Amino acid sequence: MANNRNELNKNLAQMLKGGVIMDVTTPEQAKIAQDAGACAVMALERIPADIRAAGGVSRMSDPAMIKGIQEAVSIPVMAKVRIGHIAEARILQAIEIDYIDESEVLSPADDVYHIDKNRFDVPFVCGAKNLGEALRRVAEGASMIRTKGEPGTGDVIQAVRHMRTMNKQIRELVSLRDDEVYEAAKQLAVPYDLAKYVHDNGRLPVVNFAAGGVATPADAALMMELGAEGVFVGSGIFKSGDPAKRAAAIVQATANWQDAELLARLSENLGEAMVGINEDEIETIMAARGE
């Protein structure tokens, strides 16, 4: 039964392909995201830029706040739990959240083990910097992968690095002889059947989105160019001058990433972009959490 549920969850996540998932902190923001064409929203009390600025321990959001967002929109609602925090995940499943993001943006609850996602009915999203991380999360039951990037910075460089790393490792795995895949699986520290799937199909067994530092329509188009199947936008929208216009532009750019003339028009007069943090200035590297 768990296997059937896992396959169903993977197929559910496929329906989000080509879309944009936006971080929102209020029902009003959720409505702006829905009106802009977001395929889902991520409900959280503080966007990554504020979590980074505040420091301290960041935890799952208040269920009452999440319910307010669920009631405000008809699109799927996601919410984050700390890495390894089984109880937080059970709470979110109990309030009928659509997807759970086991997220490095929050303070990890367990520095060794991730949640056994196969024991849940609700689909999980997890971050990854490379192919090994991605396939380990899939083995644990993740229905969707996203690059970790570096959340709350407005700097897309790490998302680019993670996507390119994953693509390179996939190409390397595809190029191997069949009998070499066993050793590759061992080196990646992943189950053989998942390594074999990538070898045979040239892609992950689940949807792969881009996340971390996407702040402009051009950033979204770049990640699609590099093979992302959709985009998460966190701080980039509601930390900008004109959130509604920027949100709609990023949705359009993600769907039409090959149309440079349209991208040029979408990039005009968007108001002030979020103030970013350069990679060299980052004090806390969130992407290093939960490998």
Curated annotation (Swiss-Prot):
The keyword Lyase applies. Transmembrane segments: none annotated. It is an enzyme of class 4 (lyase). Keywords: Lyase, Pyridoxal phosphate, Schiff base. GO terms for molecular function: pyridoxal 5'-phosphate synthase (glutamine hydrolysing) activity. Belongs to the PdxS/SNZ family. In the presence of PdxT, forms a dodecamer of heterodimers. This is Pyridoxal 5'-phosphate synthase subunit PdxS.
